[in-house]
Amino acid sequence: MKTGYLIDMDGVIYRENHLIPGAADFVQALTTNGTPFLFLTNNSAPTPEDLAVRLKHLGIHGLSARHFYTSALNTADFLSETDPSCTVFVIGEGGILTALHERKIANDAIRPSYVVVGEGAATTEKLTKAHVCIERGARLLATNPDNWCPVSSDKTRPGAGATAAFLEASTGRRAYYLGKPNGYMFHRARQKLTELALGQPQQGVMIGDTMETDIRGAFEAGLQSFLVLSGSTRLEMLGDYVYQPTRVLQSVADLVAEIKTGKPSDRMNSPAFAERTLPGGRFGQRHQTDVFALHKPRPRPAMTK
């Protein structure tokens, strides 16, 4: 069975407005080798077309909208599948509005079936309207659980998770969170990966930089996971988690030769490497009754001046 890759973007392919070294070669190797791949992001604001254009401007060419799957698309898929005649009141911008419109899911600011929360547009007026809608019976749905989104090296902004948490606190209702690490995101992404491979089953591998979303989601979905250290996670953090990545890489550059030759590299995956770095065995794995007892909020990025 051929391997197909689900790939996070921020911290894996780029940081801010710069490609991570080796990322362009990695994508080129996937394309040249005919390896199926799908970029997977929790950011609900951009459309797939936006993301393809952004990567083109950064130096990665030849991609189309079909290579991207966002939490906005995942939310639209979820509603279309579970409640196709529903109506929504949306706090969000760009991608989530487009995805819902394309699925012909109607807006209703009075008595919607759902309040859908994405990135951006969380004004006091919108939050108040959403609060009233929920009090009237609307269910609360968040495109993803991320509390913050990076804007630049020294700036972040509230994410969908933070906005949903605000409404949870004000209404006493619990939100349902889509996007990574929700299994529905990975279920749909695997379907998309199979479509890209012209119907051939794929052995899915998730490549990401975040333990709480990328690696946990892959673990729960039964997928292999490759953690890259080019983003938000440092190697010494792995001891805080029971669920562990299948492999740890410095960046996706470590996979280029492997994809070209079909032969795995053990440079970053050897037990000796892990045991030298962390106490307690392979990646400092601990035994806990509750598998996710050590789950922590996603760490904020280091701010630079």
Residue ranges and their predicted role:
Residues K2-M9, Y14-N33, S44-Y69, A76-F273, ...:
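Asp-based, Mg2+/Mn2+-dependent phosphohydrolase catalytic module
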